[in-house]
Amino acid sequence: MRKTLLAVALSVTTLSAHADYQCSVTPRDDVILSPHQVQVTGENGDLVIKPDGNLTYNGKQYSLSAAQREQAQDYQAGLRSSLPWIDDGARSRVEKGRQALDKIITEQVGASSSMHDRLTKLDAQLKTQMNRIIERRSDGLTFHYKAIDQVRADGQQLVNQAMGGILQDSINEMGAKAVLKGGGNPLQGILGSLGGLQTAIQEEWKNQEADFQKFGKDVCSRVVSLEDSRKALVSSLK
């Protein structure tokens, strides 16, 4: 159960790494998307690109060749398409994970289980964490690269806290059911029910794991491609 919830939590950090592998590129710049420009600013300097391809780098405006302008426009287009795609993809997987766990709890424990409330709370907390990395603004998106490590740590803590409550709820609720049923050993009934819940969640994780892995690799591929484009553009300015 912990592995499934943690996988959902870690989906918010797919820009840097995911699942059991590391991406070859770790973002070192914030990306600020707005209708009138794209800004990439951080450890690699400050790059601002206008919709027509005009740009400034570290405060200096450059006179671009046709090839450089095309490079700038292509890089800008890549950022404008990739950042929303990553944001939507991560959020949809968190939602899919929540719905799957919610369904399992209903089937294994019941629709009135307190675990549903804990799961809803965790879902809201994880989405708040996601917004710390890719912030949704009224006029665009901002990617905060420094938030990745902190969100990873905070996501782990949120899952651990939720796990404690969910485990306690499951013991209490299944224990009450076992007592009401009567006969046999109530403890044995509780353990059997917990085993069934764990098995159902593990099976669901197996169903979703391949999609998580593929999404992580696709994100990494886009991040690597964007970084290559940024380096090529900046190098051409020197």
Named regions from a protein language model:
Residues 1-7:
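Positively charged n-region of N-terminal signal peptides that target proteins for export
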Residues 113-203:
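Extended amphipathic alpha-helical interaction segments
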